[in-house]
Amino acid sequence: MQVSVETTQGLERRLTITVPADKIEKEYNSRLNQVAKTRRIDGFRPGKAPKALIQKMYGESIVADVADAVMQRHFVEALVAEKLNPVGAPTLEPNQLVPGSDFTFTVSFEVYPEFKVQNLDAIKVEKPVATVSDADLDKMLTTLRKQHASWVDADEAAANDLRVNMDFVGSVDGEEFEGGKAEGFALVLGAGRMIPGFEAGILGKKAGESFDIEVTFPEDYHAENLKGKAAKFAIKLNKVEKQDLPELDAEFIKRFGVEDGSVESLKAEIRKNMERELTQALKGQVKEQILSGLLEQNLIDVPKAAVTREVEALRQQALQRFGAANSKNVPQLPDELFQEQAERRVRVGLLLGEVIREQDIKADDARVKTLIESLATAYEDPSEVVDYYFQNERLLNNMRDLAVEDQAIEFLLSQAQVTEKATSFDEVINKAGAAA
């Protein structure tokens, strides 16, 4: 077998493989004999039909089968001999196979890039440092109470954080427009749900009042016919309401699974959850900086086939989030929506993979156990979740992969230029939410 390797462009390779005539002849005769033994031909006992007749009847299909078998086998042999690692499905281009003659075919494919990670000491990380303060805990308690609050009539003018109930009719140039009319519409003032100027026009008004508000729709408003248009809303204010927060009593506290109903136990549970959330957010922000620095210091080509696979995976994830993964009536989400993220994911995967290979990082059993136990704390019965993971090899392997990735990130962090920055719980969590 003769093999030549050509770099056509970037990571694209073309193999030209020539298989000698004697191997083709041997392969052809083997296939011909097999067909002769298994095919039933009228007038002949099984396996006794003349080969010339077999060739006449099945010659084309035998040649096609031989070509397929020869290409598959010798392509794999060529990859091993040339130490090539293909990405995606190859494109095979055969010439005509003629028994007794050399057979030449070409195979086009992409390969993974060969590189060494470098400049790790040039990666800069600003490591946020934060704790859960008593003030953070009290704020979370108030948020929890607000989430379970009821609304009661307020004998006061409309103000931020109060809820109003209203009827309104919107018009542009004296004409009502679609979607501009509602009855019994509830709105918490200060939430910023409405177009600029709408909520401000309600502030200071009282239940029972009727009034007009003049606003201008933003230029980037979703309805094309309303972009930049001046509008008038005729409003009748039905109610002004305020939140009635539940008391922090045993009945309220037990709703959250705190059996003794004490404020101290509730605070302890909330603090534990906040600290877990903070730890994950801090870890995520450091990881993001590490990966961004790694990408910046190591510019590598990525195989188009790998990016295409990642684009499809991201598309399916998006459809699942919309609950439309199995629907036939969902419009195709274009590749462009996912291209940049897919390329980044592939680059990160290749770079981290090389770090793991170079540093010979293996999953640490203790770390795997810690990861599973940490995940399990979010469930009602953590021990049951831990047992489930250790009894499920697929899930366990997923956690091993996470452990290896964590260890790789820790190695990269140890090589980077790290400075610490004091910050707050809210800043860390808000930043994590914005990045999600």
Curated annotation (Swiss-Prot):
Alphabetical list of InterPro entries matching this protein: PPIase_dom_sf, PPIase_FKBP_dom, Trig_fac, Trigger_fac_C, Trigger_fac_C_sf, Trigger_fac_ribosome-bd_bac, Trigger_fac_ribosome-bd_sf, Trigger_fact/SurA_dom_sf
GO molecular function: peptidyl-prolyl cis-trans isomerase activity; protein folding chaperone; ribosome binding
CC terms in the record's Gene Ontology section: cytoplasm
EC number(s) stated in the UniProt entry for this protein: 5.2.1.8
Subcellular location: Cytoplasm
Domain PPIase FKBP-type residues, every copy: 161-246
Class of enzymatic activity (EC top level): isomerase
SS bond partners: none
Residues annotated as transmembrane: none
Catalytic activity: [protein]-peptidylproline (omega=180) = [protein]-peptidylproline (omega=0)
UniProt domain comment: Consists of 3 domains; the N-terminus binds the ribosome, the middle domain has PPIase activity, while the C-terminus has intrinsic chaperone activity on its own.
Purpose of the protein: Involved in protein export. Acts as a chaperone by maintaining the newly synthesized protein in an open conformation. Functions as a peptidyl-prolyl cis-trans isomerase.
Name of the protein in question: Trigger factor
Organism: Tolumonas auensis (strain DSM 9187 / NBRC 110442 / TA 4)
